[in-house]
Regions:
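Primarily recognizes the serine-hydrolase "nucleophile elbow" in alpha/beta-hydrolase
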Residues: 143-219
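Alpha/beta-hydrolase-fold catalytic nucleophile elbow
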Residues: 123, 173, 200-203, 226, ...
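N-terminal targeting or regulatory segments adjacent to alpha/beta-hydrolase or S9 domains
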Residues: 7-13, 19-61, 65, 298-299
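C-terminal catalytic histidine-bearing segment of alpha/beta-hydrolase fold enzymes
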Residues: 249-299
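Positively charged n-region of N-terminal signal peptides that target proteins for export
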Residues: 1-7
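Serine-hydrolase catalytic machinery in alpha/beta-hydrolase-like enzymes
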Residues: 39-65, 69-74, 79-84, 88, ...
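The feature captures the conserved acid-bearing segment of alpha/beta-hydrolase catalytic domains
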Residues: 197-249, 254
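Glycine-rich His-Gly loop
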Residues: 91-95, 176, 204, 228-229
Length: 299
């Protein structure tokens, strides 16, 4: 059984709700043939609520989903004249309980679409709380989310010709728990078709469930990392530790620690702080990594 639940959090959200979906691409099943023996099942699934949002956010909304058992995805495509051939698999955060689909998914796709980058936003399976039951352990849950993220990469590779993207320039990244998921996938051994060319990790959660010893024996993609110094949910210490591990293992990496920007700043549009420069700095980094050459996508 599936039910959508909506909780309005302020008058501006009611206005935004009327326009929801106007510029969003089609939502598609990540696993159209179903997931065999899917361990993630909810009596009430795909529950949605709305949260306050940044008026300058590209999506103009902030929907948050929980109890996701049937993962889906959305593809954002740039116009042909802007297309750089670079693509991203975007993993929104939400502590694995939720998916902040607009703030850390659609907003990213909409923004980078204008800069010539294709984005596939994944609404992956969640480890949401069910009354009277304990949540799965991270060890039990994580392989399911990793499988969803990996399928996002494989979809882009399979559709590379139709999407006019370079299969060797597919990046993977995410926000908060989505950043943790991206790192976990990059550390996993799922075959070349599921490995990204680079990663982007925005205030990633790095507190547990990651074995950095693997970096000594397995390649890790070049990484772009962003975090705010005031962040208490995903503290700077975790990013510093991870960055140090990457450097020690000679993985090309760039870390940006901003003096302002608490957890969940997303694109940081309209903050007036240096934090809002990270999305364009990411484009510069892609040029440094020779993923983007010049011209289209220039920020």
């Amino acid at each position: 059984m599936s039910r959508n639940a909506s909780k309005i959090a302020g008058p501006c959200l009611a206005i935004a709700s009327a326009a929801l979906g106007a510029d969003f691409p089609e939502e598609q099943l990540l696993w159209p043939n179903g997931i065999e023996n899917n361990p993630i099942v909810y009596e009430e699934s795909n529950i949605m609520r709305e949260e306050a949002f940044n008026p300058q956010a590209p999506s103009g909304s902030c929907r948050v989903y929980s109890h996701v058992a049937e993962p889906t995805f959305f593809i954002y495509r740039p116009t042909p004249e802007k297309n750089t051939g670079v693509s991203l698999v975007v993993l929104p955060g939400g502590g694995y309980r939720d998916i902040w689909l607009d703030k850390e998914g659609h907003d990213i796709g909409l923004y980078y679409q204008e800069l010539g980058i294709t984005s596939l936003v994944v609404k992956y399976r969640t480890n949401s709380q069910v009354e009277g039951k304990e949540r799965m352990s991270l060890e039990t849950y994580l392989p399911n989310a990793i499988a969803d993220a990996a399928e996002g990469i494989r979809i882009l590779r399979r559709q590379a010709k139709d999407l006019n993207i370079d299969p060797k320039k597919i990046g993977l990244g995410g926000f908060s728990a989505g950043g943790h998921l991206a790192i976990a996938l990059c550390l996993a051994d799922l075959g070349d078709d599921a490995q990204p060319a680079f990663s982007f990790l925005i205030y990633p959660w790095i507190q547990e469930g990651l074995d950095f010893e693997i970096l000594k024996s397995r390649p890790f993609p070049p990484s772009f990392i962003v975090v705010g110094q005031p962040d208490k949910l995903t503290p700077v210490d975790g990013c510093l530790l991870f960055y140090g591990e990457l450097c020690e293992n000679k993985v090309p990496a760039e870390l940006h620690v901003y003096g302002k920007g608490d957890h969940g700043f997303s694109l940081a549009h309209g903050t007036g702080h240096s934090t809002e420069k990270w999305p364009s700095t990411f484009i510069d980094w892609l040029r440094d990594m020779e993923m983007i050459e010049s011209g289209p996508g220039k920020g």
